[in-house]
Amino acid sequence: MGLAPSLATLAIALVFLGISLIFLVPAMVQGLYSIVSGVFSVASSVSNETGCPQSTEVVQLSNQTASISVPSQYAGIYTLYLSFISFVGSIFTDPIALIMLILVSLIITLFAFYYKNQG
């Protein structure tokens, strides 16, 4: 029969949400910080460009997920790309984070169930 759409359902959902956020937030904050700082460094390097590439040297970029060789003028964009990949990858390769992601989706379903039955 499932959980009755009551305040108990809402309380259980909130408890699960709190527990899952404790585990998810540190990984997400770290990943989002690297993405945001990457966006700002790309924006500043693009605004400093004169239109033609100054150098054709190749730089090696790597993190725990991937490794890539790119021309140096595109290094900022590819660093951003790599940080995004590692952010997504860290959520899906870390078992605790994956479990928490599943929990969060279940919680959202519980909330939807609760509010649907309120109306």
UniProtKB/Swiss-Prot annotation:
This is Putative transmembrane protein ORF119. One of its GO terms (cellular component) is host cell membrane. It is a multi-pass membrane protein. The keyword Iron does not apply. Keywords: Host membrane, Membrane, Transmembrane, Transmembrane helix. The keyword Membrane applies. Its main location: host cell. The chain crosses the membrane at residues 9-29, 73-93, 95-115. It is found in: Host membrane.
